[in-house]
Amino acid sequence: MTKGENSIGVDDYFQDRGPTVTFSNLLYCVQETKFCRKIGPEKIILHDVSGIIRPGMNAIMGATGSGKTSLLDVLAGRKNPAGLRQGNVLVNGKVVTSDLRLSSAYVVQDDILMGTLSVRENLLFSANLRLNPKDHSTADKHQQVNTIIEDLGLTDCANTKIGTEFLRGVSGGERKRCSIGMELITSPSLLFLDEPTTGLDSNTANCIIGLLHKLSRRGKTVIFSIHQPRYSIFKQFDHLTLMHKGEVVYAGAADHALMYFTDLGYQIEPFNNPADFFMDITNGETKSTPHLLQTKLNCKNPLAIKYQQSQLYQNMMEELDHVNQSIVDGVTGEDKPANYTTSFFYQMRVVCGRTVLNTLRNPQTSYAQLALNIFFAILVGLIYYQMPLTLPEALQNSLFFKFHENSSGYYRTSVYFLSKIFADLIPNRMIPIIVFSAIAYYMMGLKPAFETFLCFALTMSLVSLAGVGLAFLVSASVSTFAMANILIALPFVFMMVFGGFLVNLNAMLSWLSWVKWISIFKYGLDALYINELKGLFLYSNNTTISGEYFLEQQGIDYSVWGFWRNVVALLGIIFVCMCLAYVQLRRINRWK
């Protein structure tokens, strides 16, 4: 984006009245890729799109794939600017930067709420992260939350949990209102919503639009995409932008749209919903005059051509030309990173607190996992209870190893990443593994020395964290659960084959022997072998074999450094996986 003397900061975006958003000649393209390789030509998502959006209810309507959500994202600054080939977006006639994402509000289509927290707790989480602690005391934040709850009609369910697949919670309409409330905490004058009525019944959808209409009458600029609203919803629109195949086919007053298309020769059936009528027109499912039928044969998108030839379009472009004259030609600047209202450590405290609370309230991720580890620890302990030191049984130690597994300017990517590690991944992996080790270790009759138990628990924890790090890297690199499940299974199977579980690594083909050095299981198994067998004697057919001899036959260095080398290797794998996962999160966080 361009920036110069006309660019503005966060505090200058909005006045008492909502801002006017203008956009001129937007051309947005995406490049289709497959396995990180570009395939085919660029696909045009938005083609020469222009418009003026003023305070009030502004609907962007169109069929699936028409480009309405893409236009909304471009206006909100949520699309990768690399795809914007031409055009600009202005707020009150001035160039905007990434700070717009912090001073406006954007409600996504799917409600992103913590299901184990109540409506009030979710709103308070938003207030804690988006209201500056220097300007707003704790009492001020609670007062703001209470005001939002009252304004959105959430008083009756304020202390009810949102709900998960295992926990019954609030209704769909209440979830949507809570999502809107999360964004209204900062009292923004510019509000974006992506299909706010999707998935709601007609009555609930009407209530949501009524809420937005009330907000718009307070001077806010409300911009939202919508598919095909009922008439009671449509009549609340002030401005309508109708999209078809990435182009605008009408932009103007919503109550003038019917007259515009009637003048083009389209005939609406009696008692038909105007919104349905407009969708039928764009889909080619309505009657038109012979003149329009001929026009359809001569161009790909006749509706867009007709709109660009209309006086309505010419008047709008004249106004846009006047607005664009204020932009300084030839001045460019970089889109600086957005400034957050709260510090890094304050964000860490709030996000970690929510993560811990979610873990404690979600039995599937805490108590059930701990109980499962205790169950398997007792089971393994009973199977190998007080195992004798005869050679066949001693070599079956490999049978009982256990391994386990998100922008609207709320907080930094690094805060999410570190809170995920310190408040979620480490407690959920290390505590169950330590409990597992404490039960199984002594039941199996392994070395009674406490330091060997600590080495056992340390190794098990590191192997688990290394597996989690690899899973975290894969999940941060792909966008679907199905693909993540496939990609995470392959390396684990690969590492098990070359980790010493299934074959003797010394008997492996020489040109494949290098593969063992990237196996998590190889380092974990070697460390456990050294920890248990060093200084131990195994008996078989009146023959005594030292543990050191067995380790030598396996090609395992049983020196002090030999053990800690495996620990360092596991720490290295954890560090590399976590760093790469963080890089992936940084890469995809802003625009996906």
PLM regions: where:
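ABC ATPase C-loop
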Residues: 183-184
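Catalytic Walker B motif of ABC-type/P-loop ATPase nucleotide-binding domains
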Residues: 191-195
